[in-house]
Amino acid sequence: MLTYLVFILAIAAIYALLAQSLVLVWGQTGMVNLGLVGFFAIGAYASALLTRNAGLPAFSGPVIGLLAGAAVGLVITLSTLRLRDDYLAIVTLGFAEVVRIVASNEIWLTGGTDGISGIPSLFSRTGGLTFHLQFMALATGLCLVAGLVITRLVRSPWGRVLRAIRDDQVVASVAGKKVVRFKAQAFMIGAGIAGLAGALYGSYISYIAPDLFLPLITIYVFLAATAGGNTRAIGATAGAYLLVAWLEASRFLGEVVPGVSAVQVASLREITVGLALVLVLRFAPGGLFRERNEKAPQT
């Protein structure tokens, strides 16, 4: 039981990283990245291929995932940042599906639908509970570091420019701010964090396949960020932990509700997630941790 709880905490920390990746992109800049799971997959596959096939050390996996996600994020931003918000959302959603389809069909590289197994781990798997505790501590520590960095960026002059772009892009441009450059920087940082999460995920479970990177993951992460507050790292983190707690608790609905099959339980989980999103948007649109109003500078 303890091993299971530690495993859930480790997965929650990875989801928290994914939710944090939306803070700068969505919460601060106003860009809707529906291709989040694509960057998650890019980080996982890049890390797995270079540590398992190319023989790079396992500890380089998170760095590889971070750099791969950031690099692909930069390419996407340079291609799409001049699009309106709704078109950007559509393009990024399509990007995530392209990544999944390529991973499914390029068998020579990704193993196709069979995926990649035997991914080197950062810690010895023979340790049992110790292995899970070590990985949980690492994932939680990286989550805290990412949260602190994001918080510092949000409170910096750079973060204020992002909010100016979010509130009125034209005014920010007229004020002399290079909108495209700031958007590209925010998107690249967010994509890098998502890639880092993917590398950690692959290393932890030692196996990745296209079916693990469905669009549903993006929906879950957006729900987590919405519930906790998409403008603050602490809100995104809290939302991710609440989401994972509910997803795991709802697995046992079949034991609570009589006459419900396993298939029906899975359907009920998705219904409750959708209902939770509607309720959050209705009663707490700013999330549990709303954006703080900045005080005007005193003269």
Predicted segments with their positions:
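Transmembrane alpha-helices and adjacent helix-loop boundaries
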Residues: L2-T299
